[in-house]
Amino acid sequence: MILIYVRLFMELSEVSLICKALSDQNRLQIIYLLTYGEQCACELLEQMKITQPTLSHHMKVLENCSLVIARRKGKWSHYSLNRDRWAAFRGYIESIRDEDREKGESRCSL
């Protein structure tokens, strides 16, 4: 059943890449901040209290797994959450949770 969900939402290699990207607390915080809407790099820097090179590194990781979309406006980059990608990832995680429930129920009936 899980393999069906993986094909519907995203490839397992993509899920793995996203999990790796989310394994850092700074990147988790960035995702959280972007759930409120597009943010300029300057706004993220101010809220997170990190350096510009550190932010650039984290944004590159999030862009590489397509969780974040970047666009230039003047001298600053503006970032937004790729909501379709985020929804697909969440759908995969929820499918695991649902599968665990089904397995848990069937174990008791054996």
Describe each region flagged by the PLM.
Residues S13-T54, K73, S77-R85:
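N-terminal helix-turn-helix DNA-binding core of bacterial DNA-binding proteins
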Residues E46, H57, E63-N64:
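Alpha-helical residues within the helix-turn-helix
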Residues Y5-F9, L34, N64:
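Compositionally biased, intrinsically disordered low-complexity segments
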Residues L3-Y5, V15-S16, T51-P53, V61-E63:
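Short secondary-structure boundary micro-motifs
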Residues M1-E14, R85-L110:
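Amphipathic alpha-helical dimerization/coiled-coil segments
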